[in-house]
Amino acid sequence: MAGGSQENTLLHLFAGGCGGTVGAIFTCPLEVIKTRLQSSKLAFRAVYYPQVQLGTISGEGMVRPTTSVSPGLFSVLKSILEKEGPRSLFRGLGPNLVGVAPSRAVYFACYSKSKERFNNIFVPNSNIVHICSAGSAAFITNSLMNPIWMVKTRMQLERKVRGSKPMNALQCARYVYQTEGIRGFYRGLTASYAGISETIICFTIYESLKKHLKEVQLPPSSNGTERNSRNFFELMFAAAVSKGCASCIAYPHEVIRTRLREEGTKYKAFIQTARLVAHEEGYLAFYRGLFAQLIRQIPNTAIVLSTYEFIVYLLEDHAK
């Protein structure tokens, strides 16, 4: 009994790790663009009409412009390609790959294990089970992986002219430790905890859609290949819809987290950052980079979840 449970946990660890790695590689350029859009260093560039004069960046004497032009996804993409070269679109991929496989592996293993436990407490496979399982898994994963995501964000925000050598992950980690100490690796963790709401929303919608789609089955005459193909695309659809809805609802925590992780930042705490961003840039600033996030996260989550489910299906089928 214990051996079967251990094998099941290892299966979810392996499947989650594979899914996360595949998704990270395919969507890395959009991750870099999204992080740049969320950064305050982009916010105060010359994107306003010239007749408006701003005061200091700290906000003293600042006159908020009545009309502003915010740089979009394609503007940032063009700027990165022209000034830094195409390799910069993969900044932070190293720590992302180092972190994403264990991160997804831990997440899916915790989610699966929590689901087993909560099914014994609440009505099996009910919404409350999915909410508690997703929340528990996200809390554990965020606590363990924040140092790696901190280094990744710093690397993505670093701007280097074409031809110059950027910091690698180890150099970046060493620099953070020397300038900020151990606490520096946990900047943005409170925002990540706030982001657990996104995970809960995502998995609740995903499990509900999966349950609904399972009820609409192909007729018995359908062959196995057709059935498996439809199941795979149904899972991708469920993952894409659930992540899209969750991202739109809970996106502001992403902007706050990026601001908290910036180097030499004036942003100190979650609430203080939220107030400062709202005061200096307006409430729309909380949704900067949302388009990049959606076109990155929707396919990424679809790839991760469908790869995870597919590997679980293959390995369980092989074990029979």
Located regions from the model:
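Matrix-facing interhelical linker segments
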Residues: M1-K320
